[in-house]
Design a protein with these regions (language model features):
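Sequence-pattern detector for short linear motifs
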Residues: 172, 176, 191-194
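Functional-site microenvironments in short loops/helix caps that host divalent-cation chemistry
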Residues: 1-174, 181, 198
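Short, structured beta-strand segments at or near domain termini in extracellular proteins/domains
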Residues: 183-197
Length: 198
């Protein structure tokens, strides 16, 4: 619907979000169409990449903004979230807000907390932190349709308009089945920056 042209895309599954990243890569490569030009593919961010971006590269930052949980100044919320019991509209947004409604973080990224939660490429495991390290920074498994549901869970980050301040913290993680779309889950595409060595 045209009224939502500047809102985050929601209701898409992890599989659909991944397919969009692949389509976007193909579209970009066709539009450039030059030999010898390296174009990194679009993809979903890993859980670690997403969290680093949301924390402004600081291990102390719980939220993308400077301090606090966002509830200190009623009528001036830094994100679209549920600031109190049943207070969905207290931040003036009952549903996902338009993109760029709230201030960006220090990296210039908008809505890294609240508004809509976001798919990551990381497979969910309750012991995820133990499975990942510098040599193995991502736990990835692309489940097949025949796999059991427990293998189809993906990490979702950022919280959404329906979540309270605790669940929009950058260190919080949630899970959803990769074939399910939800009205509170969206995605953002990323690309790896290739250094020229200069």
């Amino acid at each position: 619907h045209p009224a939502y042209a500047h809102h985050p895309v929601v209701g898409v599954s992890w599989e659909q979000a991944t397919a969009f990243c692949e389509w976007r890569t193909m579209f970009l490569r066709r539009s450039i169409n030059r030999e010898g030009v390296l174009i990194e593919k679009y993809r979903l961010p890993t859980e670690a990449e997403w969290e680093l971006a949301a924390r402004n590269a600081s291990s102390d930052s719980r939220y993308p903004w400077e301090t606090g949980d966002g509830k200190e100044e009623p009528d001036c919320y830094p994100a679209n979230f549920n600031p109190g019991e049943g207070a969905y509209a207290a931040d003036n947004h009952l549903i996902p807000a338009r993109v760029r409604t709230f201030q960006p973080n220090l990296f210039g990224l908008y809505e890294m907390a609240g508004n809509v939660a976001e798919w990551t490429s990381t497979a969910y495991s309750g012991s995820g932190a133990e499975l990942m390290n510098d040599l193995n920074p991502e736990y990835r498994y692309d489940a097949r349709a025949s796999d059991p549901a427990i293998l189809k869970r993906k990490v979702v980050k950022g919280g959404s308009w329906k979540d309270n301040a605790t669940f929009i913290r950058s260190d919080m993680r949630d899970t959803e089945l990769q074939h399910r779309g939800r009205s509170w889950i969206g995605f953002r595409c990323v690309r790896t920056q290739v250094s020229t060595g200069k």
